[in-house]
């Protein structure tokens, strides 16, 4: 079985080393807290105004301000800043936190579309950071898709310890 990282690289077209080049520079120190807040605000304004009802419905049970805060706190923490997300919400556990949502190839592409627009409309993000962030986001989106597909496969497999199974 291929690892989730391998699947993410295959499906996203972004090799792991390019995805994790995000760590070459402390993006939090380079960009600052307000830039991450602006990026997440730009992103979720687009998501909540999306023309596609199926995509908006993924976020229907989340308050926009909470979604913005969760995202920018995760980005800050992941990109070299203080552990804001973990202090408030615990371990990021991306696959587990996204488990209730339909994380499909189509949803990943729609998410990435909005993130690209948000990156392009956040002027304080330099070109090098933008490219590295795009690669990280693309790889991570498909990491979540791979995790979702693995979850579906596991749900379809009967448990060998299921009630009524013959263990003799």
UniProtKB/Swiss-Prot annotation:
Outcome of gene disruption: Reduced shoots, roots and leaves size and fewer leaves, but increased number of flowers and small pods containing less seeds. Delayed nodules formation of smaller size.
CDD domains reported in the protein's UniProt record:
TrHb2_AtGlb3-like_O (cd19755)
Q: Which family does it belong to?
A: Belongs to the truncated hemoglobin family. Group II subfamily.
Q: Name one Pfam family in it.
A: Bac_globin
Please report the organism this UniProt entry assigns to the protein. Lotus japonicus
What does the subunit comment say? Answer: Homodimer when ferric.
Function field: Hemoglobin-like protein that exhibits an unusual concentration-independent binding of O(2) and CO. Required for general plant development and during nodulation. May promote shoot organogenesis from root explants.
Q: Which domain of life is it from?
A: Eukaryota
Expression induction:
Repressed by cytokinins (CK, an equimolar mixture of kinetin and 6-benzyl-aminopurine) in roots.
Which positions does UniProt annotate for heme b binding? 98
Keywords carried by this UniProt record: Heme, Iron, Metal-binding, Nodulation, Oxygen transport, Transport
- GO molecular function annotation: heme binding; metal ion binding; oxygen binding; oxygen carrier activity
Protein known as: Group 2 truncated hemoglobin 3-2
Q: In which tissues is it expressed?
A: Equally expressed in all organs, including root nodules, leaves, roots, stems, flowers and fruits.
**PANTHER family recorded for this chain?**
TWO-ON-TWO HEMOGLOBIN-3 (PTHR47366:SF1)
What's a BP term from Gene Ontology annotated to this protein? nodulation
Where in the sequence is the signal peptide annotated?
none
